[in-house]
Amino acid sequence: MELKNSETKINLMRAFAGESQARNRYTFAAGQAKQQKLHVIEAVFTFTANQEKEHAEIFYNHLKELSGETIQIDGGYPVDAAQDMAKLLRMAQHNEFEEFDPVYPAFGATAKEEGFAKVANSFDMISKIEQTHGERFGNLADLLEQGKLFLSDVECGWMCLNCGYVFTGKGAPEKCPVCDHDKGYFIRLSMAPYTGA
């Protein structure tokens, strides 16, 4: 089957549109987190937005042979506008889990049936990434809802995302003693990027 006559063409454009919109929603949410001085959540939304941009580009690149054409799609896309940060995180979690299952597996199955193995592989692998995104947003929402984003029941490491200072205690310090940034920049060391072996 040719891509121009396929359902996969439409699914790729739907996925491109969805990833592009997710990127913008997360960029908007990052700005809101920054206003609320939740810089750790700002960083996670920005980090995830950049990954969504990459997903959009992957799906778009699968459509290159159709350059110059207009692909009509019909789809529903979420409006996630809330002032409550935990609610924004929960909405993001929900949307990511929908892409994980059922949306991208169904798109992948269609691509496979139509003979587009590389496209099917992209949908399958990206669906697993979306699961990770959903889990990440859910973990942060849990901590925020429990009042434990900057507190712990046990001593643990806390890293300042601005300068890298690591503090050990049951909670993040109010201010970083090195760079003077507020506690909104601290993340549990176990959740900090690039710290694993």
Where are these regions (language model features)?
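Non-heme di-metal
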Residues: 1-197
